[in-house]
């Protein structure tokens, strides 16, 4: 059987300080990829870094709001400078409002749409040019509403 290897690949998993994103990033690390993740707050990035370290993974964490195009562009440029060009993007960052829809305000729904739909577009837009230059890349989008 051929072993699955991501040696030499850089994987950015958004919102991967914990939960599904953390589990996905751990799988990429176990396959040999260099793991990069972001979260919206420094405290979440710090907790994520500690969790990866506890699992024996050297991850790279960045504070970035995926709905802010300037922050995303700056993060991607910083990752490319410090870690390398992103080969794999997993758009995992998301938000869920745990309230009945009929109780949700339009502003709350717009926040969900902004993070869960616009965020993946903004991050993908930032990484695609380098993927095109390299001649390859993978983008995986995860979304729930």
Protein language model features and the residues they cover:
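Flexible N-terminal pre-Rossmann segment of NAD(P)-dependent oxidoreductases
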Residues: 1-10
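A short, exposed helix-loop element centered on a Lys and neighboring polar residues
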Residues: 124-125
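Conserved glycine-rich cofactor-binding loop
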Residues: 10, 17-19
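The beta1-alpha1 cofactor-binding region of Rossmann-like NAD(H)/NADP(H)-dependent oxidoreductases
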Residues: 42-43, 62-75, 106
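Conserved glycine-rich Rossmann-like NAD(P)H-binding loop of the short-chain dehydrogenase/reductase
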Residues: 33-48
């Amino acid at each position: 059987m051929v072993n699955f290897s991501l040696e030499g690949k850089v994987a950015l998993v958004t919102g991967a300080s914990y939960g599904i994103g953390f589990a996905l990033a751990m799988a990429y690390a176990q396959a040999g990829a260099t793991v990069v993740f972001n979260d919206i707050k420094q405290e979440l990035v710090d907790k994520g870094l500690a969790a990866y370290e506890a699992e024996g993974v050297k991850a790279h964490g960045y504070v970035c709001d995926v709905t802010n195009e300037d922050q995303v562009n700056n993060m991607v440029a910083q990752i490319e400078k410090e870690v390398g060009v992103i080969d794999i993007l997993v758009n995992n960052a998301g938000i869920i409002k745990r309230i009945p829809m009929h109780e949700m305000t339009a502003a709350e729904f717009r926040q969900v749409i902004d993070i869960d739909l616009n965020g993946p577009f903004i991050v993908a837009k930032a990484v695609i040019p380098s993927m095109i230059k390299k001649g390859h890349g993978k983008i995986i989008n995860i979304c729930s509403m």
